[in-house]
Amino acid sequence: MSAVMTPAGFTDYKVADITLAAWGRRELIIAESEMPALMGLRRKYAGQQPLKGAKILGCIHMTIQTGVLIETLVALGAEVRWSSCNIFSTQDQAAAAIAAAGIPVFAWKGETEEEYEWCIEQTILKDGQPWDANMVLDDGGDLTEILHKKYPQMLERIHGITEETTTGVHRLLDMLKNGTLKVPAINVNDSVTKSKNDNKYGCRHSLNDAIKRGTDHLLSGKQALVIGYGDVGKGSSQSLRQEGMIVKVAEVDPICAMQACMDGFEVVSPYKNGINDGTEASIDAALLGKIDLIVTTTGNVNVCDANMLKALKKRAVVCNIGHFDNEIDTAFMRKNWAWEEVKPQVHKIHRTGKDGFDAYNDDYLILLAEGRLVNLGNATGHPSRIMDGSFANQVLAQIHLFEQKYADLPAAEKAKRLSVEVLPKKLDEEVALEMVKGFGGVVTQLTPKQAEYIGVSVEGPFKPDTYRY
């Protein structure tokens, strides 16, 4: 094994095992070859150093792909301090490789809730005092919330927040509506090169991988219920169909439900006539009694509630690929049923009571990743080529906000600029072009006459903001 040396005297990190750094570095090198957009931005902007002076607080899954993102930010001039946004999602070899490179990181797989919050605090603090950060890169909104609640004085120096996922965007929009958001944010999640790649195509790849790794089950011929048919639900449904499962979809949005029908999925409800009145009587027990696998994909709370869990088929697999663990009512399961760990991130939930269980009892559910992100808890998440688009968006969003220097503006101007916006389409197209080049593709250029005819520039952007890809 080739050695990776941590800079002498560098102790500003906490990872599971620093000796995993060489392994992590080897995987980082491979990931770089699979992330053409991110590496293209690194080459394109390295000479300009657009992030020189940027001090970025980062809270996103500490994976190999995130390691490439971190080192790209550093290559463009930034200083960063990093933690993971999920207690199970860290790849310990990735965290070790970043620490060995002299970059502050606080993350390991299997953190407790208390350790998770401690890790975020360690990114905020340097030598026991709030770091003079001026940018935030978040996934899910926990870092953003802690800064607003516990360190509001730091927000006076912060130019902006870039948010990775649906849940975090919802939290930002709520804060903006309630008047509690203090700095502008870019909604990276709804960039086309994020939402279509990460949310749809990424889940198509990684969901069935995680379920198979966690359970060793054959999926073909079995029945699955996917809760939600947004981009994550679409990719998840395709992922299970690829395995030969009989996939049904539950949706609250008629448009998404229509899309599911058009894509060949049966749209059903776990509730009789679609109405949840909070009672067991409202559950469609005949439907749930046939379901072998249930997957939540919504970013909403209790979409797989206690009454549904009671009615599910014996030995059904239950998992979530939304951001937080509250999509499934795991609190009810902890309070009322016995948990038996089969292996890390795989539990048998015995529905025979809270105290004790018979190991040979067959009235149980198999819960993956304790209801947290299954693809990162039970597998390694999306492949590098998928995360390439998401993280290239993050880099461009960080540059975009850092150049605007919100914290330096007069108060009156700040009030006008306070918003949650999607990354400009021209930047979205820049990411897409680099990704196409990475596949060896060639994009056709409009002639001036063609561009004039449809009312766009030869260089783009090519679609209005209202266009639905």
Curated annotation (Swiss-Prot):
<protein>
    <recommendedName>
        <fullName>Adenosylhomocysteinase</fullName>
        <ecNumber>3.13.2.1</ecNumber>
    </recommendedName>
</protein>
<feature type="binding site">
    <location>
        <position position="300"/>
    </location>
    <ligand>
        <name>NAD(+)</name>
    </ligand>
</feature>
<keyword id="KW-0520">NAD</keyword>
<comment type="similarity">
    <text>Belongs to the adenosylhomocysteinase family.</text>
</comment>
<dbReference type="GO" id="GO:0033353">
    <property type="term" value="P:S-adenosylmethionine cycle"/>
</dbReference>
<dbReference type="InterPro" id="IPR015878">
    <property type="entry name" value="Ado_hCys_hydrolase_NAD-bd"/>
</dbReference>
<feature type="binding site">
    <location>
        <begin position="228"/>
        <end position="233"/>
    </location>
    <ligand>
        <name>NAD(+)</name>
    </ligand>
</feature>
<dbReference type="GO" id="GO:0006730">
    <property type="term" value="P:one-carbon metabolic process"/>
</dbReference>
<dbReference type="InterPro" id="IPR036291">
    <property type="entry name" value="NAD(P)-bd_dom_sf"/>
</dbReference>
<dbReference type="InterPro" id="IPR020082">
    <property type="entry name" value="S-Ado-L-homoCys_hydrolase_CS"/>
</dbReference>
<keyword id="KW-0554">One-carbon metabolism</keyword>
<dbReference type="InterPro" id="IPR042172">
    <property type="entry name" value="Adenosylhomocyst_ase-like_sf"/>
</dbReference>
<dbReference type="GO" id="GO:0005829">
    <property type="term" value="C:cytosol"/>
</dbReference>
<feature type="binding site">
    <location>
        <position position="199"/>
    </location>
    <ligand>
        <name>NAD(+)</name>
    </ligand>
</feature>
<feature type="binding site">
    <location>
        <position position="198"/>
    </location>
    <ligand>
        <name>substrate</name>
    </ligand>
</feature>
<feature type="binding site">
    <location>
        <position position="139"/>
    </location>
    <ligand>
        <name>substrate</name>
    </ligand>
</feature>
<feature type="binding site">
    <location>
        <position position="63"/>
    </location>
    <ligand>
        <name>substrate</name>
    </ligand>
</feature>
<comment type="pathway">
    <text>Amino-acid biosynthesis; L-homocysteine biosynthesis; L-homocysteine from S-adenosyl-L-homocysteine: step 1/1.</text>
</comment>
<feature type="binding site">
    <location>
        <position position="194"/>
    </location>
    <ligand>
        <name>substrate</name>
    </ligand>
</feature>
<feature type="binding site">
    <location>
        <begin position="165"/>
        <end position="167"/>
    </location>
    <ligand>
        <name>NAD(+)</name>
    </ligand>
</feature>
<dbReference type="Pfam" id="PF00670">
    <property type="entry name" value="AdoHcyase_NAD"/>
</dbReference>
<comment type="function">
    <text>May play a key role in the regulation of the intracellular concentration of adenosylhomocysteine.</text>
</comment>
<dbReference type="GO" id="GO:0004013">
    <property type="term" value="F:adenosylhomocysteinase activity"/>
</dbReference>
<feature type="binding site">
    <location>
        <position position="164"/>
    </location>
    <ligand>
        <name>substrate</name>
    </ligand>
</feature>
<feature type="binding site">
    <location>
        <begin position="321"/>
        <end position="323"/>
    </location>
    <ligand>
        <name>NAD(+)</name>
    </ligand>
</feature>
<keyword id="KW-0963">Cytoplasm</keyword>
<dbReference type="Pfam" id="PF05221">
    <property type="entry name" value="AdoHcyase"/>
</dbReference>
<feature type="binding site">
    <location>
        <position position="375"/>
    </location>
    <ligand>
        <name>NAD(+)</name>
    </ligand>
</feature>
<feature type="binding site">
    <location>
        <position position="251"/>
    </location>
    <ligand>
        <name>NAD(+)</name>
    </ligand>
</feature>
<keyword id="KW-0378">Hydrolase</keyword>
<dbReference type="InterPro" id="IPR000043">
    <property type="entry name" value="Adenosylhomocysteinase-like"/>
</dbReference>
<dbReference type="GO" id="GO:0071269">
    <property type="term" value="P:L-homocysteine biosynthetic process"/>
</dbReference>
